[in-house]
Amino acid sequence: MALVLLLAPVAPALASQVLRISAIPDQNPERLNRLYGLLASELSDQLGVPVKYTPVVDYGAAVTGFRRGDLDLVWFGGLTGVQARLQTPGSKVIAQRDVDAKFWSVFIANQSSGLKPFSDQQDLQQLKGKRFAFGSESSTSGRLMPQYFLAQVGVTPADFASNRPGFSGSHDATLALVQSGAYQAGALNGQVWDSRLKEGKVDTKKVVLLWRTPPYADYHWIAQGNLDQRFGLGFTNKLQQSLLSLTPSQPRQKTILELFAAGRFIPAQASDYANIEAVGRSLGKIR
């Protein structure tokens, strides 16, 4: 009886532990809520713990929430992931999609801009004087790497119309703004572009693909370093394996992978993002 009384307070404490997952808000909220709601259910079933998806208002909030310990597992872009990891000692990169080692951005334009597709990076200079939109200010594929490729050919943010670019906040928003003509051109996640094109959400009479960038590493999962202490020895490895084991042969897992636009998840490590860190420092996004 004494043993039962001694252990009784422990069980509720363990049961109260919730794995809090989140992600940068890079696409429309409805799509993200569906994706991470499904993923939370899948992880909860596999791990045997409650899993809650907590949406954030912007990219910076994802980094801040992770740094403060309010979020346990976050789907970051390349830049935000590096920022979050450097600000959170002990945190660990655990996975990326099969497409993330060689990711890419696209530059698009409204047909009325007069801009035409090109294969030479030097032709990015044609964007000077145009109304141009990036995505989020902290987006890797929607801002950091496009700005890097622009800088390589001598195009700075001050070269755009009104001496500054616009920031749409997400890839879907950039596409919508360029398609509507509010901006003459913009840059966004290449995979989002390809997906929306396939889904029939791009009006090719209004929008043209100008250029695809060279590849770079991008999105990845980062976990807090204290998960084994909170959920039990080996939990972080079990969490990683749960992500790596997602397969199209299971209906719910297939939907999750499709929403991630991935064939599967693969292992990743911090060194995979060394180039992103270097570019981030060169453009003043990491200090």
Question: How would you describe each model-predicted region?
Answer:
Residues A15-T80:
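Extracytoplasmic small-molecule ligand-binding "clamshell" domains
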Residues L19, Q27-L38, I222-A223, R230-R287:
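An extracytoplasmic/periplasmic, membrane-proximal ligand-sensing/linker region
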Residues P25, S105-P117, A217-F231:
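A bilobed periplasmic-binding-protein/Venus flytrap-type ligand-binding module shared by bacterial periplasmic
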Residues L38-L47, S141-F167, L197-D203, A278-I286:
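Ligand-binding cleft/hinge of the Venus flytrap
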Residues Y53-T64, G77-L79, P157-A176, P215-A217:
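Short helix-initiation/N-cap motifs at beta->coil->alpha
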Residues W75-T88, A151-Q152, L177-S180, Q184-K205:
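A ligand-binding cleft/hinge motif common to bilobed small-molecule-binding domains
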Residues S91-D100, A161-R164, L197-P215:
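Short beta-strand->loop
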Residues R97-V153:
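A conserved helix-loop-strand patch within extracytoplasmic ligand-binding domains
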